[in-house]
Amino acid sequence: SQGSSNLWPSEVIGESSGGFTFSVRVLGNANVTFRDLGTIESSLDSGERFGEATRTYHDGVVQLDQRTTADGVDLPDDGYTSYWSMLNDSQVLPDQSGIAFHNYSTISDGATVDAESGSKPGFDLELSRRFGGFGKRMSDNRRPGSWGGFLGLGLTDINAKTTGTINATLRSITDVYSLDGATPPTAPYTAPSTETVTVIGPDGTETSVVINNSILLANQPISRTVTDEAGAAAIDGFWQVKGTYVSARTGVWSRFHISRQLSIRASAGVSFHLLGVDMRYDERLEDETLAVPIRAQEQGETTSYEAVGLFGSLDVELWLTRRTGLFASFTYEGLSDDLALTLGGRTADVELSSGAGFRFGLTTLF
């Protein structure tokens, strides 16, 4: 009809000089194995065993003594301090002769966890140029087939993450301080401590008086032991590899019109990939008996990688006008690469592959 000839003139779609597509693509995945997990160094300073110093622990602190005379003059060192604190009653030795303080850290037992980043949507642009046509001309003087070259650019995100609990060796540094015969306090306890008492004078007058009832503790350990218990630390963790890869491609294409409104387009070429990824982790050992959680967390800087692969696609195109249409495409990018990221003594083995994917979007000819 006349309306049909206006919509689909004899200058057929396939004889346009070039084209442009904008689409959403779903492509690629990454499998990640995180290795050597679970080493957490203590953030507390327990110092050396000998000598007067402030020593901090996961269940208390022993500070330098700050006792003074009534005139504010420091008392001579008598080997004790009234500035210390404890968190748990279990720190009192069975014979009640002293208090045990602990500084914990963990050592990796080689724990591993796996994470996967499945196919995620990204954006894709392609610019094409027609080089020629093929096939016997039809009654309207058009050729059913055409071919040319293309340049394409795609963007895809990677986000492989997981949470879980791993086991590691628990290292305990135990320092024992003498009470020198004093009665152990009830935990939690902080010295110096005071007590308010009522004093009755000779005339029967009651007066409230604040007295120092601090319990003195030795100002340095009488013993120190270090023990390692394999698998005793249950560590909760979060591990992630995150990034983006940009793929550029070039090659040749061929289009064949089944009808005025329906065509099939195939393309093949090479693809170039630039990948930027970073690794992060957060591992922690928490317990109600610890004043400070044992924790290690870090995020690494973005690391760049380059790779080359193959590209192929098969498109089904539905033309809405002589120059504009919709398309759906099955794609393949033959990219396969193994990467290794290291951070804080931990390693992430990344197996990156593109494989089969899908695109859909808008195409226009000019």
Give the location of each predicted region.
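Outer-membrane beta-barrel transmembrane strands
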Residues: S1-T39, D95-I166, A230-S263, S267-G269, ...
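Extracellular/periplasm-exposed beta-strand and loop segments of Gram-negative cell-envelope proteins
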Residues: R35-I40, S85-G118, I158-Y245, L274-A307, ...
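Glycine-centered flexibility motif
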Residues: L44-G51, T56-G60, G122, L179-G181, ...
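Substrate-binding/catalytic groove segments of enzymes
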Residues: L318-F327, D337-A340
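Intrinsically disordered, low-complexity segments enriched in small/polar residues
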Residues: R55, D78-S82, H102, A187, ...
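Surface-exposed charge patches in extracellular/virion surface proteins
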Residues: R67, R224, T363-L365
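N-terminal, post-signal peptide beta-strand-biased segments of exported outer-membrane/organellar beta-barrel
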Residues: S1-Y83
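Acidic surface patches and DE-rich sequence motifs
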Residues: T69, G201, T321
